[in-house]
Each structure stands twice: as structure tokens, then as C-alpha cells.
Amino acid sequence: MKLDVIKLDGGKGGSIELPDDIFGIEEIRADILQRCVTWQLAKRRAGTHKIQVRNEVSRTGKKMYKQKGTGGARHGSRRAAQFVGGAKAHGPVVRSHAFDLPKKVRALALRHALSSKAKDGSLIVLDSATLTEAKTAALRASFEKIGVTNALVIAGAQVDNNLKLAARNIPNVDVLPNAGLNVYDVLRRRTLVLTKDAVAAIQARFQPEEAA
């Protein structure tokens, strides 16, 4: 598929040919996208939730009263879950929430995420993403010219420092290098903005997979 390339000032920068196997998938697999997003969010959870179990609660372990002859139910330690101040039964413990997702499924999800943006007309290719000075107002004005209000910008192998500084105070705009491209961030923003260098990097990223 062919897409026009624009400049940050709104001018034309030619055109670019995008590979259909990455940007031109017609039937978007929502189930694959959901699996990948769930995998990403689970992997980044801290998993530091913790509650005291029976051997950690600061209460006596002495038997409450004798086993027989009271007419009451049989009880032992006051740390048991049924008592006020006792332990929590089967409470959360420190653990990792991460789970495995095959590399091929992750790659397929990224293809479908990129294709979904192209299909919706929410994909913009920039000639380059560099600024002469780190001015937020100037960058916001440039974004307004090209219709960007809520976007993920993949700015190249290295993010231009002026661009990074200017963009960090603009709400709903994320700027990442090529290596930071991921399914969750693509889907959470309305528009995907790629530089020509980023497009080339995406193509190179999928080449080893195709060769295999």
C-alpha cells in the first residue's frame, strides 16, 4: 500500500510504499490483540501484594480452651481465619503475574495492530521527527497542522532530544524510539505516527521472521 509522507510543518514529503503483510492485513484479529495486551499488562504488574498468613500473625497459638466439656465448638489457635485479628485464608502473596506468550503470536499481534491503524486511516508517516529547539508550543502547533491530538510517535532509532523535551508536556502524546514499539501503546493512542526511519526499522524487524 502507498501512503503520503508529510513534514512536521504540514508540507508534503513525497510518498512511501508500505508492505501489505505488515500494514495491509484486512481482517484484524481482535483475539490476538487482546492476548498480547493482557500479556503486556500482566508482565508489568509489580506483584508485591502481600497479607499475613497464619504463621505471621501476631497472636497466641495457645489452644483457646480445652477440647471437651465446654459445650462450645472445638478451636485451637486464635490465628485461624474465622477469628477477628486472625490470618486471611488464601490471601495474596508476592508473585509474578507474567505468563508466556509465543514470540510468533506477539509478532502477529504487532502486525495486526499496525494494520488496524492503517485500515482506520489513523497512520501518519513523517519525513523526520527532529526539532531545532525544544519548544512545546511550537510542537503542539505542528501537531495541530497535521491533525495529531492523541498519538504515539515512533521517532527513529534515537528520539531527538528537542522532540522528547517538547513533547513531554503535551497530554495524550507518547514519543518512543523504534525499539519501544509495542502493541499496547499502539492501540491505546488514536493515531500512530511513524518516521520513514521507523518504517524501515519495522520492515527490518520482521525480516528475520520471514527468512525463518
From Swiss-Prot:
MF-aspect GO terms: rRNA binding; structural constituent of ribosome
Task: Please give one Pfam family short name.
Answer: Ribosomal_L4
* SUPFAM superfamilies membership: Ribosomal protein L4 (SSF52166)
Q: Quick one: signal sequence residues?
A: none
| Keywords noted in UniProt | Ribonucleoprotein, Ribosomal protein, RNA-binding, rRNA-binding
Which InterPro entries does this entry report, sorted A to Z? Ribosomal_uL4, Ribosomal_uL4-like, Ribosomal_uL4_dom_sf
GO BP field: translation
Query: What Gene Ontology cellular component terms go with this record?
Result: ribonucleoprotein complex; ribosome
The UniProt function text for this chain reads: One of the primary rRNA binding proteins, this protein initially binds near the 5'-end of the 23S rRNA. It is important during the early stages of 50S assembly. It makes multiple contacts with different domains of the 23S rRNA in the assembled 50S subunit and ribosome. Forms part of the polypeptide exit tunnel.
Quaternary state and partners of this protein? Part of the 50S ribosomal subunit.
Q: Which NCBIfam families does the record match to this protein?
A: rplD_bact
Similarity-based family: Belongs to the universal ribosomal protein uL4 family.
By what name is this protein known? Large ribosomal subunit protein uL4
- Give the species this sequence originates from: Phenylobacterium zucineum (strain HLK1)
